[in-house]
Amino acid sequence: MSWKRAKMETVVQVFDPFAKNEDGEFSKNPVELPARSFKQVIHWKDGEILIVETQDEQGQLLHFYYENKDELLSISLNDNRTLETEDILPYQLRFRSRYKDDRSRALEETGIIYKAIAYHISDDNHVFLSIGDFESGHFALLNPKTYDLISIHNRLWLEDENWLELKIVFKNYETYRWQTYAKVTEYFLDNRLFKRATVSKIRTLSRLPIKGLQEQAWKLRHLQTATLQNDYAL
């Protein structure tokens, strides 16, 4: 990773992966849900800081994620639009860290616990570097020459012991300040698109605006504590 500190902005589109047409069949084209879209401002310092502000189209804060060394806060702020941590994390940044522990954590955050490394040849004879357990469905594929992340694969188990295939695809790679990054990240359930994140702005920074972000995290942490005390008051 060539960047030490960066600010990234993304626009996230959300789709209904199981929308049906008039005949009751799954729609061939994904149906976008504009009211569910959101945007993000991401501040990142390799190995130390990851702060994600997730906002609606009007700029109202929906979720705030604050990670600064050992400090961690992840809070959903809109009762009508609950977002979990896995909904908002920009996975490619941690995957490209220069620090082994961060790269390992990125794998674990996407369900890849067993980290065996091997070459994988696809049906169309493309060669990838595979990390994880290919047979179990929990693995990541990388370009063996550039180490660019190509895709992450996982399985979401259902109550009836069946599963849905989760696939995250990283594509349209561009280069900024000697570092490649995926301009577009797409999320699929059983090969049906349900989310697309597009990087709209990116720049490296000499310093993060950490003081203001720390103050915001402090206020939100105390708000969360006060809300819990109120909700569970006897």
Predicted feature locations:
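Coil-to-beta-strand transition motifs
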Residues: 46-50, 124-126, 134-137, 144-151, ...
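N-terminal mature ectodomain segment of secretory-pathway/periplasmic proteins
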Residues: 1-79, 133
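Short, surface-exposed linear segments at secondary-structure transitions and domain or protein termini
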Residues: 48-49, 72-75, 94-98, 150, ...
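Flexible, processing/modification-adjacent segments and terminal tails
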Residues: 4, 68-146, 155-162, 219, ...
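Beta-strand-dense domains in secreted/periplasmic systems and polymorphic toxin scaffolds
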Residues: 52-54, 75, 152-153, 168, ...
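Non-transmembrane domains of secretory- and envelope-associated proteins
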Residues: 11-17, 25-26, 58-59, 79, ...
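Aromatic-rich beta-strand edge motifs centered on tyrosine
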Residues: 42-44, 63-70, 89, 99, ...
